[in-house]
Amino acid sequence: MLGINYKTINSNSVGYKTDYEMRSFDFEEFLLAKGYSQTQIDSLLLHMQKLEPFTENEFELFRELFLDFSVLGGMPAVIKAYLESNNFSKALQIQKQLILDYEEDVKKYSTGVEQKKILEVYRRIPAQLAKEFKKFQYTKISTKARSKDYFGCVEWLKDAGVINKCDCLNFPELPLKGNVDNNKFKLYFADTGLLVASLDEEASDELHENKNLGVYKGALFENLVADALVKQGFGLYYFKKDNSTL
C-alpha cells in the first residue's frame, strides 16, 4: 500500500471468521455507561428530532454530560477510570498511555523508515487542526516533505482505525467518491478524547478544567462531528470554493 510494509500476520481460513469493526463509545453508549436507561436516551433523541425545547434543568444536565463526553472521548478504559474515580486526572493518565500504546503499535506493525513517517503524520495532527484552515499539509512536517512520500502513511493510520480522513471535493455533486481531490484532505483523531490529551498542556488544562471547546479554533467541534458521522457509517467530505467552505 504505497510503500507501507505490513508485517506478516498469520492468515485466517476464508469462511471461518466474522469481522466486526469496533470503535470507541459514542454519546449514547457513554450515557448507558453512566447508568441512563435506553428509555431515557430515546426520550432525549425524540426531543431533538421534534425540536422540542428541554426544561432549563434538562438542558444543563445534558449539556454537562456532553461536555464531559467531549473531553473524555469514548475509549472504554478511559470511561471506566472516570466512572470509578469521578475525576478527569485518572482518565487523562489512561488517555496519555493509550497514545503511547498507539505509537508502540506503529513500531510493531510497520517496518523501516515508514515507522518514522507514520509517527510524524500522527503527531502533527493536533497542530494541523489548530490552523485556521485545517487542510493537512505535508510541508508542515518538513519543508521537503512530498505527498507521494507520506500518503501511504495516512492510509496506514486510517486503516488501523487511529484517524478519520475527510476528503475535499472538486464539486459538491454525486457520486462524492468520484469528485475527490486526492491532494486535499483533513485528518481527525478517531477518538476526540485522545485528541484532547494530545494537545499542549495549556489547551488540555483549559478543556479539562473549564470545558472550553472553543480552543484550537474549533478543531474540537470538527473532530466531534467527524467522529459521530463515522460511527454512524458516513464517509467524510468537505467542499471549499473561493473564500467559503461547505
Language-model regions: role of each:
Residues Y6-A130:
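Interdomain motor-coupling "hinge/lid" segment immediately C-terminal to the ATP-binding subdomain
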Residues I79-L246:
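Accessory nucleic acid-recognition modules appended to NTPase machines
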